[in-house]
Amino acid sequence: MKTLLLSLVMVGFMYLVSGQNRTCRSCTGALCLKIEQCKEGQNLCFERKITDDFFGMKTVRGCADTCANPGENEKVTYCSTDNCNS
């Protein structure tokens, strides 16, 4: 009986640990207050700064699954802890 109980506790613990998702700031402006629960597999937060000749700089923050190469006039940083892209 103790073995069965221990097995159930271990399975429950593994289920809870594997179900935790990253949280990241998610917005399209300089002031970023929204926190997003990332989808499964998205273990990175990013901050993308886009330089535009007309409007200056635009900042986008959110969740990502992989690190992508920045485009022209972009600077992208990635991090792997909760809300690290603030």
Curated annotation (Swiss-Prot):
* Cellular localization per UniProt: Secreted
Task: Give tissue specificity per the record.
Answer: Expressed by the venom gland.
The record lists the organism as Dispholidus typus (Boomslang)
Q: Which Pfam families match?
A: Toxin_cobra-type (PF21947)
A GO CC term attached to the entry: extracellular region
Record-given protein name: Toxin 3FTx-Dis4
The organism's place on the tree of life at top rank: Eukaryota
Family indicated by similarity? Belongs to the three-finger toxin family. Ancestral subfamily.
What keywords were assigned to this record? Disulfide bond, Secreted, Signal, Toxin
Using the record, list the residue span of the signal peptide; answer none if the entry has no such feature: 1-19
Q: What is the lineage of its organism?
A: Eukaryota, Metazoa, Chordata, Craniata, Vertebrata
What are the cysteine partners in each disulfide bond? 24-45, 38-63, 79-84
Q: A Gene Ontology MF term for this entry?
A: toxin activity
State the Gene3D superfamilies in the record.
Answer: CD59
